[in-house]
């Protein structure tokens, strides 16, 4: 990728390019989701200390997806990446009930960010392959998603591991990009 | 005209030259005699005669001394270098990926920029962190020492500001505000009186270091400026832009002198050669171009790469050019012929540089390795392995016996 490629992906993108920010707590499955989107091997994924960027073609768009590490000590740096974001994807580990409050808090703070104001948000209720996973409806309720009124939003249950539900989410992304970009 | 008197002669190893300190009237001045073509087997007597003819300050009384200096330069050039580099230290105090790295002139200190919004100053010999320069509100991307002095550090950030720091104390002297987008390149002028910054806002700015004020805005590009560089004398600056062109500006007036038009893709890199006669540019259009720095006319296109050219540089003497793409290449700046292909990296090469002596080339790649190459033959001399993610930046110290590499894996490595 190199620093120069990062600069190219940083500038305001032409109509056919979409900048997607992938956020969520550590171990939510962001990198697995990113690799699933890029059809890459997902068997050896380690915690992201910085960021990963991949470009994927979908429905006539070039989706530049930025996967940002979610560990607590590096969450204050999420802000480094807000500029020119077209779509926010927020990933939740649906089986990690102990941290629903924490993840809800982080999401609420993101939605308050000026640089992300009005940016459509897709919430992936990930890890539905686990038996203990909470259904998307329960998460939506727990996180009070229905109170989001300043932007379009969607919650989509998925398994980044199996790929189930991922494409449905990305369809929503492309649909909502097209209304914004065109 | 005031009388001129030579005070003393100094050596400059890279590029080879002799510096004359002299007094004119009451003023103390310096000038240099560049010996860019000097080789270990150059006829010293003939060369010194030539120098004497050209330079009135060199009188019969100091000829012996000049001969001695030239011989020292030749010895330096002739030194066999089979230094094997090995890992000395891994520095892990940045908590997010590194951006750029830079040495001071003597190589005693170096700096690293990071996504963690800091720039750190390190002691090269011990690997100890001397200062963490904190205050930016976003990624610290572009960094520089005011070489050859090295007493100041400049940092350019995605927070749209640039800061000037004291190397000694780590205190911030000035914060330069005015750009309306990320600052991604910067450079001190050789006199260390000005700082130039290039931004994604399509402008470059010149700042007065003493006053802490903006001196000029270089307005003319229609897209992001991602590279800039002063010439050796400091009276010209070039800006490379995503608008496919390079601007040549007069530093004194801030006026655009030439626009180098010809590339069919974004510019990735642009540099003057030592004697300020040539400009080399690299582009996403897979080519490099050579231009006359004086007239701004196109001289040659260095084609051959099959992918985007991500970096390009002259050697210290300005006689050869190294280019980075999927592979790296070395060209003769005079004949424009490709001298060597540096093949072996398994992913794109994002940075390339010569060692000061010019016999060795260092490349940094997305394949997580840095490699050393023989500049004449293109043979890979060494693979520096250990980083666990892409290497974004690399640098040689002036002596050429220490290398630093900065990586997306959040670490910086020192190699001896």
UniProtKB/Swiss-Prot annotation, chain A:
Locations listed in the record: Golgi apparatus membrane; Cytoplasm, Cytoskeleton, Spindle; Nucleus; Cytoplasm, Cytoskeleton, Microtubule organizing center, Centrosome
Single annotated GO MF: GTP binding
Coiled-coil stretches: none
SUPFAM superfamilies: P-loop containing nucleoside triphosphate hydrolases
Annotated Gene Ontology cellular component terms: axoneme; centrosome; ciliary basal body; cilium; cytoplasmic microtubule; Golgi apparatus; Golgi membrane; midbody
InterPro entries in UniProt: ARL2/3, P-loop_NTPase, Small_GTP-bd, Small_GTPase_ARF/SAR
Annotated GTP binding sites: 24-31, 67-71, 126-129
Keyword Cytoplasm: yes
Keywords: Cell cycle, Cell division, Cell projection, Cytoplasm, Cytoskeleton, Golgi apparatus, GTP-binding, Lipoprotein, Membrane, Myristate, Nucleotide-binding, Nucleus, Protein transport, Transport
Family classification: Belongs to the small GTPase superfamily. Arf family.
Protein name (Swiss-Prot/TrEMBL): ADP-ribosylation factor-like protein 3
